[in-house]
From Swiss-Prot:
Catalyzes the irreversible transfer of a propylamine group from the amino donor S-adenosylmethioninamine (decarboxy-AdoMet) to putrescine (1,4-diaminobutane) to yield spermidine. The active site is at D158. This is Polyamine aminopropyltransferase. GO terms for cellular component: cytosol. It is found in: Cytoplasm. Homodimer or homotetramer. Its main location: cytoplasm. It comes from the Bacteria. Keywords: Cytoplasm, Polyamine biosynthesis, Spermidine biosynthesis, Transferase. GO terms for biological process: spermidine biosynthetic process. PROSITE patterns: PABS_1 (PS01330), PABS_2 (PS51006). Belongs to the spermidine/spermine synthase family. It holds the Pfam family Spermine_synt_N.
Amino acid sequence: MAENTKWHETLHDQFGQYFAVDNVLYHEKTDHQDLIIFENAAFGRVMALDGVVQTTERDEFIYHEMMTHVPLLAHGHAKHVLIIGGGDGAMLREVTRHKNVETITMVEIDAGVVSFCRQYLPNHNAGSYDDPRFNLVIDDGVNFVNQTSQTFDVIISDCTDPIGPGESLFTSTFYEGCKRCLNPGGIFVAQNGVCFLQQDEAIDSHRKLSHYFGDVSFYQAAIPTYYGGIMTFAWATDNDALRHLSTEIIQARFHTSGLKCRYYNPSVHTAAFALPQYLQDALATPSS
């Protein structure tokens, strides 16, 4: 792709967004997907896979803070964390900020994503790949959760949209495997798209997860990069009390953690579970 052109996202057929490309840093077809990293004056460095934006330097902190601190502070004493995907390293960066976490396992299907992001998106991982608690596994996430002998307190599925390599991370086989290796009282979270435009994905995830977990819901955050409104995150656990913790309890845990965040705070944490009525209605409608 030439510089000083416009890169158009291809996620939706009838509408979408574009980014001006100031400088292409890297573009290659890896073993699994088409990867491009380029610079944009408004959003900094941008990474896209198979024509869909995955992350930008400008607003990645919102996504990664909400995907990590919500489940970890709701759990309260997570020791072992599993990240599925997350090759850019930012999810790992946020998990390493929790000093009570003892082990962090990251399973990424595409070694190329890890390598190229370490080189071209260094601010995302911020040195977290060198954390002694961290273990990188290059493997398919579905295969890992169904075969590992390890168990985890929190599982974070930092998956792409349900197309290409990411499609398998929205299947019952994957969810069943996550339940299999999740400790009692554990929490599973996953990105689930922009619910206004991808409502069927939320409905499908809710239906499938409900077969394996006693409490299944969603929480939300506003992330400009993800076109179309509010980003939705799937939430699944067998302890329904964890979704209803008071702001005061979360505030106490947040204070003890010593975290300093740019988006996340205890009030945002509790408010994030308030879902718009159209999504509540859709989730309450029986599947045909």
